[in-house]
């Protein structure tokens, strides 16, 4: 099923770093970047020395998953629970923040704590050249601050009621609100957690590498009105183009 047609102008994305909770905190910079014009993804590597990896990195994300290598990938064990969260419009995405721990994902004997999840419209990763209407990134860190991103792709379809509590309160300008009841992130994951795995990077500046990527094979759905509301809130589509795989291998 094709992605939704563009119905909104690509406006200049506003300043505010933090599409991933740890990137802005770790680098402490305030360089303007966005998805359109002079601040677009093609220019990120030239905006700041700290962003240089966006241009020079060899293990960048997102990617187009075409050829894969079969492997006995370990099962993902998710231990998410209802938690109080903030819903933030940081100018680049709508992000749901987890101020406290307690939500974890374990894979291959290593446990990662969920820090936040956010969305990209349209998707950043592709499957055999196919772009999806939306993608969610569940961002985790292990005890050594090593990042893992669990990605869910959304097809065009009917309204996704499981997103309603977030979509109903999402700030339409920069800012954040607290949900008035606990939110269980596991409701946004499919029952089957089969996945593709590859080494990659943050998909936003500073494009730090060393990120473990798990892209789920089972898709969710979203309707056009939900996608359009997101794009209005953020001010533009917010997907980085796919990057070369180079010597990397995608395992499934």
Curated annotation (Swiss-Prot):
Domain Alpha-carbonic anhydrase: 31-252
Database matches in InterPro entries: Alpha_CA_prokaryot-like, CA_dom, CA_dom_sf, Carbonic_anhydrase_a-class, Carbonic_anhydrase_a-class_CS
Designated gene of the protein: cah
Catalytic activity line of the entry: hydrogencarbonate + H(+) = CO2 + H2O
Family: Belongs to the alpha-carbonic anhydrase family.
Annotated SUPFAM superfamilies: Carbonic anhydrase
Organism lineage: Bacteria, Pseudomonadati, Pseudomonadota, Betaproteobacteria, Neisseriales
Subunit structure: Homodimer.
Protein name: Carbonic anhydrase
Amino acids binding substrate: 203-204
Disulfide linkage: 54-207
Organism in which the protein naturally occurs: Neisseria gonorrhoeae
GO molecular function (one): carbonate dehydratase activity
């Amino acid at each position: 099923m094709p992605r939704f047609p563009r119905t909104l102008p690509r406006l200049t994305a506003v300043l505010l770093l933090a599409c991933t909770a740890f990137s802005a905190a770790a680098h402490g910079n305030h360089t303007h970047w966005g998805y359109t014009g002079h601040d677009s993804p093609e220019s990120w590597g030239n905006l700041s020395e700290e962003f240089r990896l966006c241009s020079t990195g060899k293990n960048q994300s997102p990617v187009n998953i075409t050829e894969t290598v079969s492997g006995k990938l370990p099962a993902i064990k998710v231990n998410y629970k209802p938690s109080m969260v903030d819903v933030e419009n940081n100018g680049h995405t709508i992000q749901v923040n987890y101020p406290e721990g307690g939500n974890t994902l374990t894979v291959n004997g290593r446990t990662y704590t969920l820090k936040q999840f956010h969305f990209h419209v349209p998707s950043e990763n592709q499957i055999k050249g196919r772009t999806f209407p939306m993608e969610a990134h569940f961002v985790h860190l292990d005890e050594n601050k090593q990042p893992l991103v669990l990605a869910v792709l959304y097809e065009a379809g009917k309204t996704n009621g499981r997103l309603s509590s977030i979509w109903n309160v999402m700030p339409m300008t920069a800012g954040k609100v607290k949900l008035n009841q606990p939110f269980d992130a596991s409701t946004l994951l499919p029952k089957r957690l089969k996945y593709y795995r590859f080494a990659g990077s943050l998909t936003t500046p500073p494009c730090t590498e060393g990120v473990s990527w798990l892209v789920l094979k089972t898709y969710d759905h979203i309707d056009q009105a939900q996608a359009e509301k997101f794009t209005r809130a953020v001010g533009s589509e917010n997907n980085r183009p796919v990057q070369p795989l180079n010597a990397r291998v995608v395992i499934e």
